[in-house]
Amino acid sequence: MMQHPSWPVGLILSGMPALRDMLNFDPQLARRVIPIELPRLSPIGDLEPLTEMTAFYAQEGGLAPADPAENADIAARLIQAADREFGLAIEITIDAVEEALRLGSSKPSRDHFAAAFARRSGCIDGLNPFIIGEYDRLDVRKLLQREGER
């Protein structure tokens, strides 16, 4: 990577552990990288921060946050829906806020998150973590599932 004082470039690389291995393969690149690793989300330790995050994005979109009990339920389901990945949780939240705005709602609801997840994954309602009761048993990485294909 070339560096030029009048045109500085900064890269943000996001990926799996294999990306870190690739960066470490090149000593020059490894010297120029500041790695920041985000741990996987936990339904125990990260519920409150995700509840705050969903409320933040709702307010940034000009909406009221969901009611506290519903917001906590949304956050728990969001951790599962995002496969415990923080960046994906943010993307789904933004999509849900956009869905609420598109429908003229005053605040995001679980239905908006369900629609955002369905649009992203293509899954049916019976496999949507924002709809079903036992959402924590779903393998959300299997996209475009249909009933009977589990």
Language-model features: where?
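The catalytic "switch" region of P-loop NTPases
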Residues: 1-69, 73
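C-terminal alpha-helical "lid" subdomain
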Residues: 43-45, 51-150
